[in-house]
């Protein structure tokens, strides 16, 4: 009976916060404590300059909710984006600490700090500083999320440092390479269905709009992207995401200015049981 009550409370919590499970960014909230999530993401770039070929990247990830404040995420990427053949590309580790929580009826506010470290064996291509397979580096940032009933709005700012051997050599690159940047994101999610929550087995339909921007600190270069997405949540534990990301403005050299993303994620509640 206690186990049933615990599961019911957790599932209701997942349902009420579904609209802040963003597709392209992380909210200030964490996955449930002592839970594990497994996720597989596919990014597809259609034929466009400069490569004029269909490129794919697959990212398996594992999320671990250590407690209500700490969360870890580890992943790897496999792709043919920087090479002709499809191969293992990178590994990374992400951690998030929620340091502020303010709860009210049908609303809450969260703030968290996050850090990420990534190693990539991909060649140094393009200006964009991305730790999702493209570059080795470090990232540190802060994120805030506000939930009002069916609407969730989130924003983040982070600093990135690219780590590549060319950073310390004496070669003169034209244009100069980018090793430092600031990332900015603004995301909004809305719970469209169900209109009334009755049971955790109801399918949720969430709509998202996200803005993602990067500004180089080494020279004047930037981009601003827009990423609408749709999300289905089944049994409050399995998520299916579909998004399309495209550039609104910018002057950075990038691998692609638009791409599709599809992902599926399964959460295993109370997988890390407390020792008695």
Put a short name on every predicted segment.
Residues 167-169:
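Covalent nucleotidyltransferase core used to form phosphodiester bonds in nucleic acids
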């Amino acid at each position: 009976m206690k186990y049933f009550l615990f599961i019911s409370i957790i599932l209701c919590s997942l349902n009420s916060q579904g609209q802040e499970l963003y597709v392209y960014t992380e909210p200030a909230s964490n996955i449930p404590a002592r839970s594990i999530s497994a996720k597989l993401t596919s990014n597809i770039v259609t034929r466009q300059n400069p490569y004029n070929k269909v490129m794919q990247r697959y990212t398996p990830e594992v999320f671990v909710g250590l407690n209500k404040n700490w969360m870890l995420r580890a992943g790897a990427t496999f792709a043919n984006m920087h090479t002709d053949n499809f191969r293992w590309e990178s590994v990374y580790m992400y951690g998030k600490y929620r340091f502020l929580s303010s709860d009210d009826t049908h609303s809450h506010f969260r703030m968290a700090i996050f850090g990420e470290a990534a190693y990539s064996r991909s060649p140094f291509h393009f200006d964009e500083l991305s730790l999702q397979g493209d570059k080795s580096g470090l990232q540190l940032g802060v994120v805030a999320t506000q939930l009002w009933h069916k609407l969730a709005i989130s924003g983040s700012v982070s600093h990135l440092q690219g780590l590549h051997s060319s950073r310390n050599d004496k070669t003169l690159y034209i244009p100069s390479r980018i090793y430092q940047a600031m990332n900015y994101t603004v995301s909004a999610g809305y719970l469209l269905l169900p209109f009334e929550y009755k049971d955790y087995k109801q399918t949720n339909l969430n709509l998202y709009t996200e803005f993602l921007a990067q500004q180089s600190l080494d020279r004047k270069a930037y981009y601003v992207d827009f990423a609408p997405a749709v999300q289905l949540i089944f049994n409050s534990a399995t998520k299916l995401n579909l998004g399309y990301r495209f550039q609104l403005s910018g002057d950075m050299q990038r691998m692609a200015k638009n791409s599709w993303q599809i992902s599926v994620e399964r959460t295993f509640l109370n997988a890390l049981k407390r020792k008695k």
